[in-house]
Amino acid sequence: MRFVDEATINVRAGKGGNGCLSFRREKFIPRGGPDGGNGGDGGSVILRPTNRLLSLYDFRLQRNYEARNGQSGMGSQCDGRKGEDLVLELPLGTLVFEVDDEGHEQMIADLSDPDGVFVVARGGRGGKGNEHFKSSTMRAPRFAQKGEPGEERRLRLELKILADAGLLGLPNAGKSTFISRISAARPKIAAYPFTTLTPNLGVMIDEVDPDRRMVIADIPGLIEGAHTGQGLGHRFLKHVERTRFLVHILSIEDIDPENPWTGFDLINEELARFDEVLREREQIEVVNKIDLRTPEEVDALRQQAAQQGRRIFFISAMHGEGIEEVVDAMWRLRDTIDMHEPLVHLQEVEEEDEEFEDIEVVYTRE
């Protein structure tokens, strides 16, 4: 499926059913009292996050969504049926923005809790039947309420992938090979830059405890100026905002002997320019493709990193060398760093059984 991380949709909740204007009519009871039932409430539009989806592609294909209307009330005090709710499943980590008529946006939901749901458009309340208005002073009310219209909203959906670890690096650093080594992900791998055009997700399973898992996001290669839109990284930098930590991979081919860690510093600067908080995010620094250099050259780099106080892992993702040490470090970080809090907490909204502010009545002839 094509990866899509933004979409705009229109949602409309169902209209409440009209209340019924009816009187009891039976043999030998010429003046039966009112017996009009209430209309059913309209169905609501509900958003439910799920980890089964990784793209908003379906919401690019279909943009309009409507819940069912409530049925009108009937005689003999029969209430109308409530309209069926429309439940839309969205990828876990989706941000929901309401867009007004002038194009202004306001975030209304952060779907980062797999057990949470959000009522984005509430169905209209059903109108009261004339039996509801019977009183000691009004024995035969000849009016009933109409149902309320359902809420309508225009929404912009923005997916920010929820992952434990984010893989970063310059193009052709070997991130895709690395993620294919440690998980069941099978991204496209080739010896040219920008092989990865969209984020790939992999799940690493603990060999001792199969229920212990780590989700890893392979972010497309970043280049200098990514925060301003250069290269491919500009669109995907947002996907690292919610990771617990980052795994920064640098190809040994990109190392300058005079200043070997420039590649790490360049990407870190791009992260900071995109969001200053990312500068402080925990990182694991990895030099990949050590099989392309002699053991003596690799040892010299190890010593230089140690002298400068940098803990850097040296690996060959192609041949599996050094992978186990990186994986152990990733598990340690995953277990010590909490997932980031949602930007907007979902709140349960209690339905209030209140009267209509403005009663719209339907009269019958005398």
UniProtKB/Swiss-Prot annotation:
Requisite cofactors: Mg(2+)
UniProt GO molecular function: GTP binding; GTPase activity; magnesium ion binding
EC number, as in UniProt: 3.6.5.-
Chain sites annotated for binding Mg(2+): 176, 196
Residues covered by the OBG-type G domain: 163-335
InterPro entries the UniProt entry points to: G_OBG (IPR031167), GTP-bd (IPR006073), GTP-bd_Obg/CgtA (IPR014100), GTP1-OBG_CS (IPR006074), GTP1_OBG_dom (IPR006169), GTP1_OBG_dom_sf (IPR036726), OBG_GTPase (IPR045086), P-loop_NTPase (IPR027417)
Catalytic EC class: hydrolase
GO term, biological process aspect, one: ribosome biogenesis
GO terms under cellular component: cytoplasm
Job of this protein: An essential GTPase which binds GTP, GDP and possibly (p)ppGpp with moderate affinity, with high nucleotide exchange rates and a fairly low GTP hydrolysis rate. Plays a role in control of the cell cycle, stress response, ribosome biogenesis and in those bacteria that undergo differentiation, in morphogenesis control.
Subunit comment: Monomer.
Protein name: GTPase Obg
Organism for this UniProt entry: Nitratidesulfovibrio vulgaris (strain ATCC 29579 / DSM 644 / CCUG 34227 / NCIMB 8303 / VKM B-1760 / Hildenborough) (Desulfovibrio vulgaris)
